[in-house]
Amino acid sequence: QPSNGVSNNTKDTLKIANKIGYPVLIRPSYVLGGRAMEIAYDDKALKFFAETAMQVSTNNTILIDQYLENATEIDVDLIRDRDGQVFVAGIMEHIEEAGIHSGDSACSLPPFSINAEVEDQIINWVTKISNKIDVIGLMNTQLALKDNQLYVLEVNPRASRTVPFVAKSIGLPIAKIAAKVMSGEKLTNLIPSLERKKLETFNVKESVFPFNKFDGVDLILGPEMKSTGEVMGIDKNFLSAYIKSQIASGNNLPIRGNVFLSIDDSNKNRLLPIAKKLKKLNFKLIATKGTRNFLQKNKLD
């Protein structure tokens, strides 16, 4: 797990954050949708976020976690029966980096960049966790992969919002199967094989946002959920599946026009290859002052 701590006052929150090291993820306990969840990069921001989080929390308790920058987030849904048999229904790789709420991030099933060794490690970990907590039915686990190291972010012994997407992707009614398992039936009597079969298509879930309906809404995604729906794209090729998901969500991908770029200093080098590709495709680049200066220094106008 990432380094973490629990607090119920601002003073202790600051101590924990400085011990862990910035940036940190701060959130109230027992809330859904990432409400009042924020990423703090210094003491000033942390104080403000801590006071807000304590107001939202039912018992003033707030959780402080090390924020894993530039990590890949992974969702896993499984079913476990009373005999300890486990069926890993789906391993989903998020397209947005860890730190974007899982309900807002697009994801692919199967993963598009995670190697088989890491997938095997994920299956091993989630199986052990489900056995340790003795879950009967569905369990969702959220993990992060950074520098080839896996971290467990969250374990939910319940159905997740990804269940309908996983069911459509693998062609099994996993909610119905989980309900029967909770009633005492065995997985081996409900599923032909507990081994995960190789999927013939990439299935991409994309979120739908209401930004065009509400003026003044912050468009920047973060730990607090903003989406109001989801769609999926299916294709034998990952990129084609992703494009289909974008079109389904109402994002018609342009082939010409302007692209607005604005990014913090720590991520500017990661922006450069993207900006070069956009320029090669004849898009006009528009940027904030700092980003513009960076692009001009790298011979991009």
For each feature predicted by the language model, list its residue ranges:
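A conserved helix-loop-beta module that forms one wall/lid of the active-site cleft
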Residues: 1-37, 298-301
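Short acidic loop-to-helix transition motifs that present clustered carboxylates
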Residues: 6-12, 45-46, 69-71, 266-268, ...
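Short, ordered loop/turn segments at secondary-structure junctions
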Residues: 9, 29, 36, 143, ...
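Surface-exposed amphipathic alpha-helices with a cationic face
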Residues: 18, 274-280, 292, 296
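Glycine- and Gly-Pro-enriched alpha-helical subdomains that act as flexible
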Residues: 251, 256-283
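Active-site rim loops that border cofactor/substrate pockets in soluble metabolic enzymes
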Residues: 257, 294-301
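Short internal beta-strands
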Residues: 260, 283-295
